Amino acid sequence: MDAIVRESHCRMIRHYRRRWGYPMQLLIDQACFGRTGPEALADDELERLHQDLERAQECMLEGISFEDAGLLRARYG
């Protein structure tokens, strides 16, 4: 992934966080556990987080919980 595409993913992740607030921050924190933030994710992890946030937005609009959508994962185990 080149630097421009990477920055585009980071920008969209920030957009989702600003628009939806805490629910999106929860998913971002889950993906970045043990790291300094989205910028520290590997390319595939960054792309996965962006995809998860797109799905999370759909869930919020459709009234589907993140648990039911499989977006919340166990941290240990």
Regions found by a protein language model. Name each.
Residues 36-42:
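A short, exposed loop/beta-hairpin motif centered on an aromatic-Gly-Thr core
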